[in-house]
């Protein structure tokens, strides 16, 4: 089912060329839900994001990374405190 919050592991992260503002294009491993692409806006180093886990909202056409907007730090993605299986639902 789409529109669920779940944990995805970042399998790939690269700068999104041609974007109006800095952003990364992410490929997320969602476990039994497969993979999805998502955009993470802001100044993020792809090497710091790759192989980490992020909370995202799964949609029919991809995923949206759940993040908090901090005036001092920009977009801060939400992450689990401990590693869990990719695709773990957030409740």
Regions found by a protein language model. Name each.
Residues 1-91:
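Phosphate-backbone binding interfaces of nucleic-acid-interacting proteins
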């Amino acid at each position: 089912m789409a529109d669920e919050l779940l944990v995805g592991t970042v399998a790939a992260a690269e700068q999104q060329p041609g974007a109006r503002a800095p952003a990364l294009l992410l490929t997320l491993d969602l476990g039994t839900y497969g993979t999805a692409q998502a955009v993470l806006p802001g100044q993020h180093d792809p090497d710091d994001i790759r192989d980490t886990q992020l909370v995202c909202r799964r949609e029919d056409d991809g995923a949206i990374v759940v993040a908090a907007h901090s005036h001092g730090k920009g977009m801060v993605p939400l992450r689990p405190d401990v590693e869990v299986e990719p695709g773990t639902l957030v409740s």
